[in-house]
From Swiss-Prot:
Organism field: Edwardsiella ictaluri (strain 93-146)
PROSITE patterns xrefs: KARI_C, KARI_N
Gene: ilvC
Name listed for the protein in its UniProt record: Ketol-acid reductoisomerase (NADP(+))
Pfam families to which the protein is assigned, alphabetical: KARI_C, KARI_N
Residues that hold substrate according to the record: S414
């Protein structure tokens, strides 16, 4: 197997990177009909597997779970989750041959083995589904020509997929059909029905490609979604304690600060997030964000380049072959960091304090979101895809840190995201520690900014620059489809 993206010529690469179309709600008028009466078999029962299955069953589909024989015999977590929710469970040999749609929702590193095992068992003309295209694009898995290959990728952790569905809503979703595997032209109908069954059509669906989903997903999770949050958490906690802050208070300010700040981002983009600051603090955050973007632009570009070339995937798959030697080392190092070991703080921090004393946190969010978006768009990824893989998902990842700090974030995200997160943070932490953190001024972090006069012309120009950034333009339109979004922040 070889990297599928690298087998394409430049025109094909650009066409697939740039495939992105926001689908009208009328295109989902048939709902789940294309899958009604069909047998859907999900392989894997983790967060995405279980919660997508629950939604699909509640939408009237026939759903079962195929697990490895040893997982059933040993009654592992996946088996218990499926059976406790009343699903039919069987091994591959029992369930795969009767499936009309086999959905592979196992971790990325298991995809090659899983797909190699289920393919020979699939009946002629069946469909194979993914929620992340890594196996097709980066591994280059070859699928039988009679099999239709589709993707439905909710832009949310599995738990949120379920919770939004139960509210009568859904989460924004990308769908795609692999151009090499659509023998009967039925792929789009299957993908649309699957997206409807999970509730995605209620929140907005982008017709994308496997290539665009993978490359943008990898870039977002490595940089702003996980890498920047890890980098900022480690550096900001270190700075606060060095300046004499109570370690417990500092830990809470960082742990819940990301979530509180990005809740404003979720509701009104960078504009609303910056509007939560006082005028002097807004000007200072704008300046800090500009400095951060200048410093980090080469690092963001390197991650994008390595993702496009396949160098990132090649390195990660080598680590898979070495039993995750690097991943496990970096995970252990993160667990021993000062931020992770900070004592609990029993007092309350009111919501506005997270903004007033977290100007640097706001600046880091602004810089990271804009840089990730700009880098993806400059590489041929359409603005809508770049928005979903940067700004949209950030509050959801920040929420995991609020629950159990970086440990929870790295447990919830995929191993692929975790590996990329460490690569980014391992480079960004020393870069910013030496070239940026030492230049901070009083009021940037931990203390309110001293009162000072504001130049009206400067404030006007900053406000215009914030509002006119391309991510704000596309974000305002896409958020219009998500007016029922619930508030997720739990800070206190």
């Amino acid at each position: 197997m070889s990297n599928y993206f690298n087998t394409l010529n430049l025109r094909q690469q650009l066409a697939q990177l740039g495939k992105c179309r926001f689908m009208a709600r009328t295109e989902f008028a048939d709902g789940v009909n294309a899958l009604r009466g069909k047998k859907v078999v999900i392989v894997g029962c983790g967060a995405q597997g279980l919660n997508q299955g629950l939604n699909m069953r509640d939408s009237g589909l026939d759903v079962a779970y195929a697990l490895r024989a040893e997982a059933i015999a040993e009654r592992r977590d996946s088996y218990r989750r499926a059976t406790e929710h009343g699903f039919c469970v069987g091994d591959y040999q029992a369930l795969i041959p009767q499936a009309d749609l086999v959905i592979n929702l196992t971790p990325d590193k298991q995809h090659a083995a899983v797909v190699s095992a289920v393919q020979p068992l699939m009946k002629p003309g069946a469909a194979l589904g993914y929620s992340h295209g890594f196996n097709i694009v980066e591994v280059g898995q070859q699928i039988r020509p009679d099999i239709t290959v589709v993707m439905v990728a909710p832009k949310c952790p599995g738990t949120e997929v379920r919770e939004e569905y139960k509210r009568g809503f859904g989460v924004p979703t990308l769908i795609a059909v692999h151009p090499e595997n659509d023998p009967r032209g039925a792929g789009m109908a299957i993908a649309k029905a699957w997206a409807s069954a999970t509730g995605g059509d209620r929140a907005g669906v982008l017709e994308s490609s496997f290539v665009a989903e993978v490359k943008s997903d990898l870039m977002g999770e490595q940089t702003i979604l996980c890498g920047m949050l890890q980098t900022g958490s480690l550096l900001c906690y270190e700075r606060l304690v060095a300046e004499g802050a109570d370690p417990a208070w500092a830990g809470k300010l960082i742990q819940f600060g990301w979530e509180t700040i990005t809740e404003a981002l979720k509701q009104g983009g960078i504009t609303l997030m910056m509007d939560r600051l006082s005028n002097p603090a807004k000007l200072r955050a704008y300046t800090l964000a500009g400095q951060l973007k200048t410093l980090m632009a080469p690092l963001f570009a390197k991650h994008m380049d390595d993702i496009l070339s396949g160098a990132f995937s090649q390195g990660m798959m080598a680590d898979w072959a070495a039993d995750d030697a690097h991943l496990l080392t970096w995970r252990a190092e993160t667990g021993e960091s000062a931020f992770e070991k900070a004592p609990p703080f029993e007092g309350k921090i009111d919501e506005q304090t997270y903004f007033d004393r977290g100007v640097l946190l706001v600046a880091m969010v602004k810089a990271g979101v804009e840089l990730a978006f700009e880098t993806m768009v400059a590489s041929g990824i359409v603005a809508e895809s770049a928005y979903y893989e940067s700004l949209h998902e950030l509050p959801l990842i920040a929420n995991t840190i609020a629950r159990r700090r970086l440990y929870e974030m790295n447990v919830v995200i995929s191993d692929t995201a975790e590996y990329g997160n460490y690569l980014f943070a391992n480079a960004a932490v020393p870069l910013l520690r030496q070239g940026f953190m030492e230049t901070l001024q009083p009021g940037d972090l931990g203390q309110p900014l001293p009162a000072e006069a504001v130049d009206n012309a400067a404030l006007r120009e900053v406000n215009q620059a914030i509002r006119q950034h391309p991510i704000e333009t596309v974000g305002e339109r896409l958020r219009g489809y998500m007016t029922d979004m619930k508030r997720v922040a739990v800070a206190g």
